[in-house]
Amino acid sequence: MNDQKMSCWRKKSKKKNSEANQRQRWFQENGKVLLEDLIELCNGKSNPIKTFSAEEILQATDNFSESNLVIRFNFMYRGILQNRPVLIKRATWNYYKSDTLEKICRDIAVSSMVSGHKNFLKLLGCCLEFEHPVLVCEYAERIPFNTPNPEMLLPWRMRIKIAKEIAIAVSYLHTALSRTMIHTDIQPFNIFVDSNGTAKLSDFCLCIAIPEGETFVKVHADRVEGTLDYLEYNYAATGLITEYTDVFSFGVLLQNFFTRTYGVVDCCCSEDESLFEEFEDKQNVMNLRISDRISKFVEEGRIFDMLDPKMLESMGDDETEEHKIRRMKAVLMLSLRCTGHRGDVPKMMEVAKELKRIERWT
């Protein structure tokens, strides 16, 4: 081997060793934060989390090729890993306002806690060998929300089923774990449907655990995060997080899902502007206008005026117009209760039970 070839070989070897050392450092740093979060949330008694190597992830996504990008704003890729289709989530520092590593580890930790439930996007494992941990999840499709393609619009039966199953998932977060977990970002982009038509809730980066014996957590106004048009007023204005934070967001989701009065889906706000400031500046927030409009239409008996015609057609000719109105009014009245526009705000378990009842109506 001549001197030139030897020099080239040494450089490649040095670069390879440097990359391996860096990945090992990331693995240790990321693993430490993840372990701390698991201990905080469940005293370390969590399900085992499978880890994948960086090489496996890069091969599965073709080096994170844009052609495999499923959701651009939160960097979700499709891939093939160990002979099965998967979704691979790779966040970046500028996706979140702050604490990116902690948020990604929270996503992994909560996902591992709920993966046994069919209505959550199942975590298959993670990779800690990148600067930001990468999640590997079962493959599912995003729900076609507010699509301009009429062929992709979901029929009534599918919409009510998805709504019911997401309500069940949120109720599970609130009641079935060792500590009450508040999702804080229930919105369409975080909902998937698998090949069997089962709805899956995902993305727990902003999930907040309420301490044992407490019913709320309060964060500083500049720490309020989420999707603006789905934020509960109290949370946006004061930083107070309760179970009703999710109930409100779910109510807005129902309103957007069953009418053609769509809200605007915003990503997290810019680093130099808090959601509190953005909320305060936006005096007639979209979800308030939607709820008020729905309330007015219900009172005036004009429900059909705000419904998606394709969805109405999908309810079938065997149903009378009166029966269709009854079912839709029940859903919309439930949504208004969730947003505080009609009577007492229900808990998510009650919401799930009511949606089951509406689904069974014949």
Swiss-Prot record:
Residues 1-23 are annotated as: Disordered. The active site is at D185 (proton acceptor). One of its GO terms (cellular component) is cytosol. Gene3D superfamilies: Phosphorylase Kinase, domain 1 (3.30.200.20), Transferase(Phosphotransferase) domain 1 (1.10.510.10). GO terms for biological process: cell surface receptor signaling pathway. PROSITE patterns: PROTEIN_KINASE_DOM (PS50011). It is an enzyme of class 2 (transferase). Its EC number is 2.7.11.1. GO terms for molecular function: ATP binding; protein serine kinase activity; protein serine/threonine kinase activity. It comes from the Eukaryota. Pfam families: PK_Tyr_Ser-Thr. InterPro entries: Kinase-like_dom_sf, Prot_kinase_dom, Ser-Thr/Tyr_kinase_cat_dom, WAK-like. Belongs to the protein kinase superfamily. Ser/Thr protein kinase family. ZRK subfamily. This is Serine/threonine-protein kinase ZRK4. It comes from Arabidopsis thaliana (Mouse-ear cress). The lineage of its organism: Eukaryota, Viridiplantae, Streptophyta, Embryophyta, Tracheophyta. The gene is ZRK4.
